[in-house]
Amino acid sequence: MCRHQPRARLSPDEQLAAEESFALYCKPVELYNIIQRRSIKNPAFLQRCLLYKIHARRKKRSLITISLSGGTNKELRAQNIFPLYVLLARPTNNVSLEGHSPIYRFSRACLLTSFHEFGNKDYTEATFVIPDVKNLATSRACSLNIILISCGRAEQTFDDNNCSGNHVEGSTLQKLEGKCFWGKIPIDLLASSLGNCVSLSLGHTVEMSSTVEMTPSFLEPKFLEDDSCLTFCSQKVDATGSFQLQVSISAQEAGAKDMSESPYSVYSYNDVPPSSLTHIIRLRSGNVLFNYKYYNNTMQKTEVTEDFSCPFCLVPCGSFKGLGCHLNASHDLFHYEFWISEECQAVNVSLKTDSWRTELLAEGVDPRHQTFSYRSRFKKRKRVEISSDKIRHVHPHIVDSGSPEDAQAGSEDDYVQRENGSSVAHASVDPANSLHGSNLSAPTVLQFGKTRKLSVERADPRNRQLLQKRQFFHSHRAQPMALEQVFSDRDSEDEVDDDIADFEDRRMLDDFVDVTKDEKLIMHMWNSFVRKQRVLADGHIPWACEAFSQFHGQELVQNPALLWCWRFFMVKLWNHSLLDARAMNACNTILEGYLNGSSDPKKN
C-alpha cells in the first residue's frame, strides 16, 4: 500500500525535477530485485537462523502457569492432594492397550506442595512455555498435554538434591511407582479458549480455571530411566474414589515484558468498539510505515508493510528491531531513520548517493567498457620483522652516480647480516657540502642493498628456447634487441636518459595553464629527484622529503615563493598520510639551517 504526499504548487520544471529525483530509487531497487531472485535458488544463509528471527519466535510463545487455589478446592484436604506433580508431556502414539493409557514422553516436570495462598512460591506454581496459541493448531505442540499426578501421601518426602526450584528430575518420578490419581488438560483445548482472547494479544495476563477429573490408576515408570516416558494402568486399582480438581491457569505472551516497553504497544483501545477490537489489533500488529524522501527531502511517498516485512525483498523480520538489522545489513544503499511512537512505527528512507554512485551505469554506456576493481587474495608470506631499535638510526644516503663501481662497493659495505638474518643498513650521512651547488647537477642514485637476480645459467632451457622464438624491443627506443641484450642482466626499463626525461617533464609541465611558474618549477624538481633517487613506494616519501630539503635547500631559501610551494606540497603529502609530523619537522629544521647560514643544517 503506497500513499503520495499532497504536492505543493510546483511549476512544470519543478515537477519534472521531483519525478527525476524519485526515479533515482529505481536503480538500487532493481539491483536488490536481481539479488533477491538469485538468492531464492542459492541462498547465502537461512532466514530462520538469524538471531533476531529466533528472538521474535521466542517472544511469540505463550507462558502458562498452573496453580491450585484453596478457596476453590475447599472440599479437598491438602494432605490428600499434595505433593502434586505437573508434567508437560506428549503421547508417543495414539494406540493404547486395554486398561492402559497412552505412553507419554515428558520434557519438564514441576512439583507443587501447597496451595498458592500458602507456602513458598517456588512450590505453588508450575510454569511451562508453549508455542504461540495462534499457530498451535498447525504445529506439533497441538498434541501436548498438561498431566497432573497426585500420590495422596502427604507424609512422603522428596529429595531437595533432585529439585531445582520446583523442577523435578526423572529419578524422583521413578520412586512414584504405585497407586496414584492422575488427570490431564489438553493444550489444544486450552488454545481454543485463549485464541479469542483479545487481552492476550495486548500483552496482558489472562486468568482462567479448568476442572480436571483425577482418576485412580497405577503409575508404571518402567520407561523413565531411558526415554523419560510413563504410562498409567487402571486395571491394578479400584476404579472408585475419583475426584475433581479446580486448577487455576494464567497465560501471557512470553515477550509481554518487552512489549510493554514499546510506545507502540501501550496504545489505548478504549475508544475502539469491542466488535472491531480484534480486527484493529490485527491491522496494527507488525505494521510499519516507510517514508521515501526525495527532491532534497522536501517531498515523500509512504508505503505500509505488514508483519515487519522488508519493502524491498518482502522478507518478514519478526520485530521492529529485526527489521532495522535487516535493512542496515542487506540494503545499505539507503539511509534509514527509525522512530516509533504510540501511533505508528515508521522508517524514513533517503538516498545514500555516495555509496552506489560508482556502481550504477550511465545511460547508453556498455557495461563491458566500464572500469571495475578486482582484488586478488595473494598467498600470505612470512615477513621478516625488524625491530625499531635496529632501524632507528637509518638515514638516506645519496651518492654520485658517476662512479657505479664505488656505489656497488659502498652498497656491499653498508649492509651487514644481523643475528636474525635480515639485512639492515648502517647509519651513513653524506656530507652536506656535496649537496650544495647546482640543483640539476650530475644525476644521483640512492644506495640500495644487493638484489638477488636469476642468472642465465640457472634459467630453464625450455624457457630459453621459447624466448629465442620471439622478438623483443627496447623499452624506450622501441628498437629490436639482440639475444645477448635480452639474456643480459640489464633491464632496458632502467636505461633512462636523465636529460631526455627532464626535457619531457618540462614540456609536459609547460602545458599546464592553471599553475604558476614556481609551482611548475617545484613539480619539475620533485619529479627529477624521485626519478633519479628511485623513490618507488609510499614508505620512501619521508626520507625522500628530508633528502630533497637537504639537496635543494640552498635554492629554496633563496626563492621565498618556491619555498612556500615546497611547504605547501609537504602539507598535501601529510593530508594523504604519506608524510608524518616528525619528517615534516625535520625538513623545516633543515630549511631553517640554510636560512640561518649554517654550514651543516642537519645539526640545527
From Swiss-Prot:
One GO term (biological process): flower development
Signal sequence annotation: none
Alphabetized InterPro entries for the sequence: EMF2-like_DUF7651 (IPR056068), Polycomb_protein_VEFS-Box (IPR019135)
Keywords: Chromatin regulator, Developmental protein, Differentiation, Flowering, Metal-binding, Transcription, Transcription regulation, Zinc, Zinc-finger
Record's keyword annotation contains Metal-binding: yes
Region entry Disordered, spans: 396-440
Tissue-wise expression: Widely expressed.
GO cellular component terms, semicolon-separated: chromatin silencing complex; nucleus; PcG protein complex
Keyword Magnesium included in the entry's annotation: no
Region (VEFS-box): 454-589
Stated family: Belongs to the VEFS (VRN2-EMF2-FIS2-SU(Z)12) family.
The name this protein goes by in its record: Polycomb group protein EMF2B
Species name: Oryza sativa subsp. japonica
Gene that encodes it: EMF2B
